[in-house]
Amino acid sequence: MSRYEFSLLQEVLLEKGAGVLGDLSRYKRQNRIEERTHPVAILYSLVWNAKQDILSAKSKEELDRIEGQFNLANEFLFKAGSL
C-alpha cells in the first residue's frame, strides 16, 4: 500500500469514526444516557479513542483494528434499533 493510499484510508476512517460518534451521541441523547459508566457511554469513549489513534497509526493492520471497532459499534446500534 502506498503512502497516498494509506492517507486516503486514514481519511475514510476519520469520516467513518465521526459518523459512528454522531450515531452513538444521538442514541445516548434519545435514551437519556448520562452516567459515564453506562455501557453505551463506555462504547462512545472506546470509539472516541480509536478515532484519535487513526492519525498515529503506522500500519494497515492498526487501521483494520480501528475499523473493526467502528464496525462493532455500528452493529450494536443496528441491533439496538438506532440505525
Cite the ranges covered by each PLM segment:
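Short amphipathic alpha-helical interaction elements located at domain edges
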Residues: 2-6, 10, 36-39, 76-83
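Amphipathic, well-ordered alpha-helical segments in soluble domains
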Residues: 16-23, 46-49, 69
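Amphipathic alpha-helical binding modules
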Residues: 62-83
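N-terminal acidic leader/helix
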Residues: 2-33
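Alpha-helical and His/Cys-centered functional microenvironments
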Residues: 14, 56, 73
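A general marker of short, structured functional hotspots
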Residues: 2, 23, 40, 66, ...
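Acidic, low-complexity, intrinsically disordered interaction modules
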Residues: 26-65
